[in-house]
Design a protein with these regions (language model features):
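Hydrophobic alpha-helical transmembrane segments
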Residues: 1-164, 176-217, 225-295
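Short acidic/histidine-rich active-site segments
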Residues: 173
Length: 295
């Protein structure tokens, strides 16, 4: 990574923006959470303004915040930082035992740290710093257009991503589920101006479902199978109690289909294949649940 620094052109455009799908044929994620949140708000209409707000919400909740998280979590710059630190001259980092009063010693230490950052750290991660800065500015700018609450949710999402980067994969998966399901859903629901406490309950349950799917790709899969089934069963029961028996039946049928797929999963233990097979049922469950709040 650090070798690419010297190969960069000296003149030309400053920034590069690349948009591409990060996962082939995978729909369950922030974009779908935004759509379901917009539907759950009851404010999504067949009008040009609603379509524009939905596009801005997807751009914020998936593209920009996802890019922020990806830049922060990518391992390349962390490995490059470690290699650069190993090759750093000793005078950059050794302690200052020189004479002088405390103010002069402090000034020399600060000067050494500044040179270390400028000469060692910035050449390695300057692209990431610039990228995160620009993405943060764009995300907050869109948030300002969409409303004050969206700005707060955007700042919260950025903070969640930063905290996730300091955790291991198992514990960080909880924050990833919040980042990719709960916050995009709430952003869309806030954008369209309607809020229901029952919707907040549903988004928390679907965040748990998403966390369970992430867990199936790691260790202790049967534990997450149980959580996945229990969470969707709760959704079906709450829908039935909320006088939406048709949607409750649809959710129950989707859960039954997943249980049938689980019999195959117990044999081959292929979590990735199982998630790819059952995600369509969860997509329908999320959308139908959002519709049930207002129809």
């Amino acid at each position: 990574m650090e070798e690419s620094y010297s190969a960069r052109p000296l003149v030309g455009r400053w920034l590069a923006l690349e948009l591409r799908p990060t996962r082939p044929l995978t729909w369950l994620g922030p974009s779908w959470a935004v759509i379901c949140g917009a539907v759950a708000s009851g404010g999504l209409q067949l009008r040009g303004q609603s379509a524009l707000l939905l596009i801005f919400s997807i751009l914020l909740g998936d593209v920009l915040l996802g890019a922020w998280r990806a830049l922060w979590l990518q391992p390349d710059w962390r490995d490059a930082m470690r290699r650069a630190a190993v090759n750093t001259p000793a005078w950059y980092i050794e302690s200052d035992d020189g004479g002088g009063n405390a103010v002069r010693r402090l000034a020399r230490q600060l000067s050494r740290r500044f040179r270390y950052v400028r000469s060692v750290i910035l050449p390695v991660i300057d692209s990431e710093i610039i990228g995160m800065t620009m993405i943060g500015v764009l995300a907050l700018s869109i948030g300002v257009v969409l409303g004050q609450t969206v700005v707060l949710l955007t700042i919260g999402a950025m903070g969640v991503a930063l905290i996730e980067g300091q955790m291991n994969e198992e514990r960080g998966a909880y924050l990833r589920a919040v980042f990719e399901i709960a916050l995009p859903w709430l952003i869309a629901q806030t954008v369209f101006g309607y809020f229901a406490w029952l919707s907040l309950f549903y988004v928390l349950v679907f965040t748990l479902v998403y966390r369970a799917l992430l867990g199936l790709l790691g260790g202790r899969p049967m534990r997450w199978i149980l959580w996945n089934n229990l969470a969707q069963l709760i959704v079906a029961l709450v829908l039935f109690a909320s006088h939406a028996p048709a949607v409750a039946g649809l959710v129950a049928l989707g859960l039954l289909a997943q249980v049938l797929w689980q019999s195959r999963f117990r044999v081959n233990r292929d979590g990735r294949a199982y998630v790819q097979c059952v995600q369509s049922y969860i997509l329908v469950t999320m959308l139908a649940t959002g519709l049930a709040l207002w129809f």
